Amino acid sequence: MSYRLLSVDKDELVTSPCLKERNYLGLSDCSSVDSSTIPNVVGKSNLNFKATELRLGLPESQSPERETDFGLLSPRTPDEKLLFPLLPSKDNGSATTGHKNVVSGNKRGFADTWDEFSGVKGSVRPGGGINMMLSPKVKDVSKSIQEERSHAKGGLNNAPAAKAQVVGWPPIRSYRKNTMASSTSKNTDEVDGKPGLGVLFVKVSMDGAPYLRKVDLRTYTSYQQLSSALEKMFSCFTLGQCGLHGAQGRERMSEIKLKDLLHGSEFVLTYEDKDGDWMLVGDVPWEIFTETCQKLKIMKGSDSIGLAPGAVEKSKNKERV
């Protein structure tokens, strides 16, 4: 069966007594078209499209519609930026705004989800969830900054002394030079008329000997002690040359060796002074010799001819007289 709806004018219903309007389907007075559009209008009126509308702007910036509709957390300075723009405000006394936003279709803020997760009851302070998470970290950061500042101040007060400037080549610091100078001055100081305990090493060489020796002139006080020490140093080499003479030759060599070194019959003891000139040992007093001697050399008597007047010529003159 097919039903046909007839549109009847209301004026005709009033004027004609025969036709009466009857509601067989139990519908309301408003038309079907009007009844279908009413829920949509109500739903659209509840939705806030301006709050979710996309706009061009700087990052984390707020539009005036969002500020008026959602009521921001608290009055803030222009430099502050919201971390969660959709977080509902608790300052207006509306504790159920989060629930209303969920019912109306808006997404919940971070504070609502945090409260539900932690099970915290009652009202929450503005930005309670954020402050709850960030406040311990902020305190730790502030404490660390204060400690660093205190350490920096202490470091400035207790700054180490500046190192001495490096001078000369190879580089030697001035304090090392000072210590070396002080040590040498102490060594040169005289105590009870005796020279200091410093050392004065000089090299000793001998013609025909394949090695060198070093002697400390400060350990000797006369030419006799120096000559006997050199005899012990080079006795093996000189006695080896005289080994053909047997035991008697060795005894004779050891007996006349000192005389040979001093008088130049076979070997002559010479030294090099500060000017680089070679001189015969024994020409000057012992103190001057220790100050000017740079090297010692035991050379053959024939090679010592032409040096400054030495002990050899003086001894020859004495023998003639």
Curated annotation (Swiss-Prot):
Tissue: Highly expressed in the whole plant.
Domain PB1 as annotated: residue spans: 199-301
InterPro entries: AUX/IAA_dom, AUX_IAA, PB1-like
Record key words, sorted: Auxin signaling pathway, Nucleus, Repressor, Transcription, Transcription regulation
GO cellular component terms attached to this protein's record: nucleus
Short name of one Pfam family: AUX_IAA
Signal peptide (UniProt feature, chain positions): none
Keyword Nucleus: yes
Compartment list: Nucleus
Induction or repression: By auxin.
A GO biological-process term: auxin-activated signaling pathway
Motif residue range(s): EAR-like (transcriptional repression): 54-58
Similarity comment text for this entry: Belongs to the Aux/IAA family.
Quaternary assembly: Homodimers and heterodimers. Interacts with TPL.
Main function: Aux/IAA proteins are short-lived transcriptional factors that function as repressors of early auxin response genes at low auxin concentrations. Repression is thought to result from the interaction with auxin response factors (ARFs), proteins that bind to the auxin-responsive promoter element (AuxRE). Formation of heterodimers with ARF proteins may alter their ability to modulate early auxin response genes expression.
PANTHER family in the record: AUXIN-RESPONSIVE PROTEIN IAA17 (PTHR31734), AUXIN-RESPONSIVE PROTEIN IAA8 (PTHR31734:SF138)
Domain remark text: The N-terminal half of the protein contains two conserved domains I and II. Domain I includes a slightly degenerated ERF-associated amphiphilic repression (EAR) motif which seems to be involved in the activity of transcriptional repression. Domain II is required for the correct degradation of the protein through the SCF-mediated ubiquitin-proteasome pathway. Interactions between Aux/IAA proteins and auxin response factors (ARFs) occur through their C-terminal dimerization domains III and IV.
The name this protein goes by in its record: Auxin-responsive protein IAA8
Organism this protein belongs to: Arabidopsis thaliana (Mouse-ear cress)
